[in-house]
Amino acid sequence: MKPKIFIDGEHGTTGLQIRTRLAERDDLEVISIPEAERRNKDLRADYLRAADIAILCLPDDASKEAVSLLEGHNSTRIIDTSTAHRVHPDWAYGFAELAKGQRERIAEARLVANPGCYPTGAIALVRPLRDAGLLPADYPVSVNAVSGYTGGGKQMIAQMEDKSHPEHLAANNFLYGLPLKHKHVPELQLHGRLDRRPIFSPSVGRFPQGMIVQVPLFLTGLEGTPSLAKVHSVLTDHYAGQDIVEVAPLEESAKLARVDAEELAGKDGMKLFVFGTEGDGEVNLVALLDNLGKGASGAAVQNMNLMLGKV
């Protein structure tokens, strides 16, 4: 029998992306609740319990409710794309390239928390340096990022695209999370293996999909004051053999005059760069990805495939 997949929240931005990605899969059976019945709690529970894997594309509270509906029904495995369970010890963190053995943890888990889009980029840059002993746990990490506006869901899409919207956003680029209390910070700190809370400054640009995440570092603050080449080698070694995360060669990065946030829009990959001038003592680590690809729906499908033993 084909595995049954239920997307709880398939009419939202991430849910629609996942549904589209699974539409041509003949190895799966996607079961869908009628849109008019999506708030019917009892019917949702039936669909959740009928699924082999339920992918939750819901706000945090609704995701917690969905999980509660599955209490006592351990045959259904869950991928949660919300923030609700990303730092919960009982949930596997769904970043397959995080560390050695992470793919296996996801493959064997019943509960998988899909990473956030910004943390995916930031952790991809920070975690290898922590694991290699280059980045001290108490280093004052700063993360600066810009995302396509689809990351804000249907509400922000309407605000950016509909000029008649009562809360229309006319800005081409804006900062938010100004009190430095963004909900992604605990996730960044835990899975980045940081003792100190990172400063996270997110922004949104007037483009639908794409993302740039930057982590600038002073090399003098790292163990042994490593060279750019050493930092680059740590990243390349960490992601060697991976087919989704790519590290740009130093020679390629040195020739670039700019990085386009939309370069990987519509794709599931992530590309990492090491920028700087050898000997200057500074490095800017950059992750390029699609906020709805590796940053959301692409990662969810990757995790689903791992859980089904298909990759």
Swiss-Prot record:
- What protein name does the entry list? N-acetyl-gamma-glutamyl-phosphate reductase
Main localisation? cytoplasm
PANTHER family in alphabetical order? N-ACETYL-GAMMA-GLUTAMYL-PHOSPHATE REDUCTASE, CHLOROPLASTIC-RELATED (PTHR32338:SF10), N-ACETYL-GAMMA-GLUTAMYL-PHOSPHATE REDUCTASE, CHLOROPLASTIC-RELATED-RELATED (PTHR32338)
Record-annotated active site: C117
Instruction: Write down the top EC class of this protein.
Output: oxidoreductase
Lineage, top-rank taxon, reads Bacteria
Q: What family is it from?
A: Belongs to the NAGSA dehydrogenase family. Type 2 subfamily.
CDD domains xref list: AGPR_2_C, AGPR_2_N
